[in-house]
Regions:
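Bilobed "Venus flytrap"/periplasmic-binding protein-like clamshell domains
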Residues: 56, 61-84, 96, 144-214, ...
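C-terminal motif of bacterial Sec signal peptides marking the signal peptidase cleavage site
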Residues: 21-24
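Periplasmic-binding protein-like
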Residues: 60, 64-65, 139-148, 240-278, ...
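Extracytoplasmic small-molecule ligand-binding "clamshell" domains
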Residues: 40-42, 47-122
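Bacterial signal peptide processing site
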Residues: 26-30
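A ligand-binding cleft/hinge motif common to bilobed small-molecule-binding domains
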Residues: 115-128, 189-192, 218-219, 223-243
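Short helices/loops that flank or line small-molecule/ion binding pockets
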Residues: 100-114, 127, 145, 165, ...
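Ligand-binding clefts/hinges and TM-proximal coupling segments of bilobed small-molecule sensing domains
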Residues: 90, 165, 170-189, 273-305
Length: 305
């Protein structure tokens, strides 16, 4: 299946979630306790959110937890610094320990815009009054990526069916519950379609971010884990020796590239500055280098449809 945008993906999500017996689409809320902790840790960065739009005012940019905070800071700080220069706004990063922390921070106006995966973007639109305004384009020019199931290179398993047959003996590293490629997509294609529950079929199931899962599989701390092609490409650059220790046993249909979401009630002046900056960013060698560290080449316009 190919998804044309967030709405077609959302329709699929609603059907797949129903088939997995999980909560219905829309409504509900992310973990407020996580958000409260994340908000407290980021209180200083959030102090200027309500005054966005004026020269030098603070805009808080939420970044989902796909790898360690230190790695995220290293990759994101040059981009956010460029955004600040080009917009005249003070763009500050907002990191949380999980995806729910960023969603809830947007809901309570501690975050003005954010980089999400498709599932977390849908939740931000439904629960945090968010609005999709842009989509990333990969550094190879494509606008999609894939969920993966990985095992150690020494593992005898070659397919997801091999893994499922021996699941009762194995430890499984699942993704963040709000992750599209780390949890939702494999949850449907690997588990729901085979009429099994990932939380029950394995000897033990853990939840972590993409980087942590890959490292755990490579170091034989777990037997199998979820990952994605974006993370794989990043790891080939940063930790090629780790990638050599991994083997792919399952690959999903294509998932749309990641959306950027801002709060609907952000002032129009700030929205225009941010959109103008992003739609032209990536045209110089310096900008291309900054985006390449994030796995992207440029941005294109998008919306909730």
């Amino acid at each position: 299946m190919h998804f044309n945008g967030i709405q077609s993906f959302k329709k699929w999500v609603c059907l797949s979630i129903a088939s997995m017996g999980l909560v219905a689409c829309g409504g509900g809320s992310a973990d407020s306790k996580t958000a409260a902790a994340s908000g407290a840790n980021n209180q200083a960065a959030a102090s200027g959110a309500s005054n966005a739009g004026k020269e030098g005012q603070t805009i808080n940019f939420g970044i989902i937890n796909t790898e360690s905070s230190q790695n995220l800071k290293t990759d994101w700080e040059p981009f956010l610094a460029d955004m600040s220069k080009k917009t005249g706004l003070n763009i500050k990063p907002f990191f949380a320990s999980d995806y729910a922390g960023v969603i809830q921070a947007m809901r309570f106006k501690k975050v003005d815009l954010a980089w999400y995966g498709n599932k977390s973007a849908m939740e931000a639109v439904d629960r945090a009054d968010g609005e999709v305004f842009a989509q990333t384009i990969n550094n190879d020019g494509t606008t999609g990526y894939y969920s993966l199931m990985i095992v150690n290179a020494d593992s005898p398993y070659k397919t997801e069916q091999d893994v499922l047959k021996d699941a009762g003996k194995l430890t499984f590293a699942n993704g963040d519950p709000h992750s599209t490629s780390g949890n939702l997509v494999p949850g449907y294609y690997v588990f729901a379609k085979n009429n099994v529950d990932a939380t029950k079929i394995f000897k033990r199931t853990l939840n972590a971010n993409h980087e942590s899962n890959a490292m755990a599989v490579a170091n034989k701390q777990v037997d199998v884990g979820t990952f994605n092609t974006e993370g794989w490409a990043m790891m080939e650059k940063k930790n090629p020796d780790i990638v050599k220790k991994l083997k792919i046993v399952w690959k999903s249909p294509e998932i749309p590239s990641d959306p950027l979401v801002w709060r609907k009630d952000m002032d129009d002046a700030s929205k225009q500055k941010i959109k103008t900056c992003l739609m032209s960013y990536g045209s110089t060698p310096e900008e291309k280098k900054v985006l390449d560290a994030l796995g992207w080449s440029k941005f294109r316009e998008s919306n909730n449809d």
